[in-house]
Design a protein with these regions (language model features):
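...with weaker cross-activation on analogous glycine-rich loops/strands in unrelated enzymes
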Residues: 51-55, 103-174
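Aromatic- and glycine-rich peptidoglycan recognition patches
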Residues: 2-17, 23-29, 148, 152-198
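Activation targets extended, charge/polar-rich intrinsically disordered C-terminal tails
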Residues: 2-24, 35-43, 48, 96-124
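N-terminal capping segments
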Residues: 25-104
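Generic alpha-helical secondary structure signal
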Residues: 56-63, 113-116, 188
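Alpha-helical interaction segments
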Residues: 14-15, 58-59, 111, 134, ...
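Short, intrinsically disordered/low-complexity patches at protein termini
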Residues: 68, 72, 125-127, 190-192
Length: 198
């Protein structure tokens, strides 16, 4: 009788460990089933990125994006405690930490809290490329217009371009800091690309 109890307890322990492993694996890796989930339910995995041939400054941007993606901090970390939409704060922080600080054209500080002002910065600095015919590169900042059908006025950073597919990582997106993908041809609502590295 005692052996049966020990066997049952051992079997339950094995099942608990296996179930925990399955839960961990499914939250850390994309599976065929998780591809069809809404963004907020998908596993958080940083996109596959090749940095071969990239400028060292662009590599630093990608490395800092990966670090911030893994940390997944709240928006107030990037906005210096201010409760606000924080996508531009996130971009400002990543670029500053990559050795490419911005300069807010209104306040003179490194942090640019708004997409409109971020766009203005890139325009005045001569670093804004139109959505077409420019082909974005990893490290470029995507600037979305208020008319964009999904994101409205928003910004994030390109991490990879594969054929016609652009993958970005940004803050104040589904799940906090997340990756989004779009096609190069789908430029409606994209103002252009801020190019921090020439």
């Amino acid at each position: 009788m005692r052996r049966i109890g020990l066997s049952v307890a051992a079997a339950l322990a094995v099942l608990v460990v296996l179930a925990g492993g399955v839960v961990w694996w499914s939250t850390a890796h994309e599976t065929p089933l998780s591809r069809h989930l809404p963004a907020e339910l998908k596993p958080r995995t940083f996109p596959t990125v090749s940095t071969a041939g990239l400028d060292p400054s662009r590599i630093r941007i990608i490395e800092n994006l990966r670090r911030e993606f893994d940390a997944n901090r709240p928006g107030t970390y990037y906005s210096e405690g201010v409760e606000e939409p924080w996508c531009a704060d996130f971009v400002s922080t990543v670029l500053r930490d990559s050795g490419l600080p911005l300069r807010n054209p209104n306040s003179g500080t490194w942090r640019i809290p708004g997409v409109y002002t971020l766009t203005e910065y890139f325009q005045k600095a001569g670093k804004l490329e139109p959505a077409t015919p420019y082909r974005p590169q990893p490290g470029d900042v995507v600037l979305y217009a208020p008319e964009h059908p999904q994101l409205r006025q928003h910004t994030n950073i390109v991490v990879s371009v594969d054929g016609d597919t652009v993958t970005t990582v940004g803050g104040n997106q589904a799940g906090g800091i997340s990756a989004l993908t779009y096609r190069v041809a789908d430029t409606f609502g994209i103002v252009g690309y801020g190019v921090p590295v020439r």
